[in-house]
A protein has these predicted regions:
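The conserved acidic donor/metal-binding loop of glycosyltransferases
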Residues: 94, 148-152, 236
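Acidic donor-binding segment of Leloir-type glycosyltransferases
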Residues: 74-120, 124
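Long helical/loop segments within the catalytic core of UDP-sugar-dependent glycosyltransferases
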Residues: 106-143, 155-238, 249
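N-terminal signal-anchor transmembrane helix
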Residues: 28-85
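Acidic donor-binding loop at a coil-to-helix junction in glycosyltransferase catalytic cores
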Residues: 238-244
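N-terminal membrane-anchoring/stem segments of glycan-assembly enzymes
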Residues: 1-52, 203
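Short beta-strand/turn micro-motifs composed of small residues
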Residues: 60-62, 92, 147
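A short, conserved beta-strand element in the Rossmann-like catalytic core
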Residues: 66, 96-97, 126, 151-153, ...
Length: 249
C-alpha cells in the first residue's frame, strides 16, 4: 500500500513537471510568432563609412582538427569585411600534426594580406576557455566572433551580425546553426530537428521578451567589454559558454 502511494505521488509529480514544461514551450512558441511579425528596424552601422565600421576579432579555437582545418581557414578567409578592420586568431591547442599544417596554411593566408595569427600554448590550461581567454588578452577587436573548427559561416556573416551592436544594450549575438550532414542518417535528421527547434523557438522566444538566452559556444559574436565585465572566460567548468552567458546577464 505504501509503495503504491509513493508510486502514484512520483507519477503525479512527473506529470505536473511535464505539463509545466509544455506550458513553458508553448509560451516560447507564442513569443517566437510575435517576434517573427516584427520588422528589424534597429540602428545599423554604415558600412560605406570606414570610420563607423568597428574592429572585429575572429577567434578559431581548435584541437587536433587536422581534417577540417584547410576548409575552415579557406572559408574564414572569404569573410566579406574590411580587411583593415578584421583580425583572425587561430587558437591552436593541438598535440598532433595539425599544428604544422595549420601554421603553413596561416602563413599562406598572411602572405596574401590577411591579418591572421597562429597562436599555440605550452599547456592546455582551461582547455577551450583558456585558449579563448589568452587570445582575448591580445585581441584588437571591439567585438569577438567565435567559430569551432566544423563551422562554415557565410561571407556576409559579420555584416549581418555586427550591426546589432549599434544598440549599446546588446552584449552578444548568437546565430542559428546550419547542418552540412542533415540528411546523412536518421540520427542526423533528428539532431538537426532538435537544434533547429532550440534556435528557432527557444532562443528567439526568450530573446524577444528579454529573458535569459545562452551563447552556444560557437557561431556567435561578443562585445569584448561584456566578456571582461562578466569576469572573462572560466576554465573550471565543462560549459564555459553557458557559464559566461549567465554571468554576463
Amino acid at each position: 500500500m505504501i509503495l503504491e502511494t509513493i508510486t502514484i505521488i512520483i507519477y503525479s509529480i512527473a506529470l505536473v513537471l511535464i505539463f509545466m514544461y509544455a506550458l513553458a514551450q508553448l509560451n516560447l512558441l507564442f513569443n517566437y510568432l510575435a517576434a517573427k511579425k516584427k520588422e528589424e528596424n534597429g540602428p545599423k552601422f554604415n558600412f560605406n563609412n570606414s570610420e563607423e565600421i568597428p574592429f572585429v576579432t575572429i577567434q578559431l579555437p581548435v584541437f587536433n582538427e587536422l581534417y577540417v582545418m584547410d576548409r575552415l581557414l579557406d572559408n574564414i578567409a572569404l569573410m566579406d569585411y574590411p580587411k583593415d578592420k578584421l583580425e583572425i586568431q587561430v587558437l591552436d591547442d593541438s598535440t598532433d600534426e595539425t599544428v604544422a599544417t595549420t601554421k603553413a596554411h596561416v602563413d599562406q593566408l598572411k602572405a596574401k594580406g590577411l591579418d591572421i595569427t597562429h597562436i599555440t600554448r605550452t599547456n592546455r590550461q582551461g582547455f577551450k576557455a583558456g585558449a579563448l581567454k589568452e587570445g582575448l588578452e591580445i585581441a584588437k577587436g571591439e567585438y569577438v566572433a567565435i567559430f569551432d573548427a566544423d563551422f562554415l559561416p557565410e561571407p556576409n556573416w559579420l555584416k549581418k551580425t555586427i550591426p546589432f551592436f549599434k544598440d549599446p544594450e546588446i552584449g552578444v549575438v548568437q546565430t542559428r546553426w546550419g547542418h552540412i550532414n542533415r540528411d546523412y542518417s536518421t540520427l542526423t535528421k533528428i539532431q538537426a530537428f532538435a537544434l533547429d527547434a532550440h534556435f528557432t523557438l527557444e532562443q528567439v522566444g526568450r530573446s524577444s521578451k528579454g529573458h535569459f538566452i545562452n551563447f552556444n559556444g560557437t557561431a556567435g559574436v561578443w562585445r569584448k567589454d561584456c566578456i571582461l565585465d562578466a569576469g572573462n572566460w572560466e576554465g573550471d567548468t565543462l560549459t564555459e559558454d553557458l557559464d559566461l552567458s549567465y554571468r554576463a546577464q
